[in-house]
């Protein structure tokens, strides 16, 4: 099942309540402010802080 991009209008980062961006290649929702990536499983975003992975930038 594909992720419905219309969900981006209503979902928010559970940590900061900010906007999330969809990364189609990695199938994740990205919070640029907190530098966290939330997985999308079978088209459903898993917006649990303990399931997020930190994004490391250099």
Curated annotation (Swiss-Prot):
InterPro entries: Trm112-like. SUPFAM superfamilies: Trm112p-like. GO terms for cellular component: cytosol. This is UPF0434 protein Sfri_2386. Belongs to the UPF0434 family. It comes from the Bacteria.
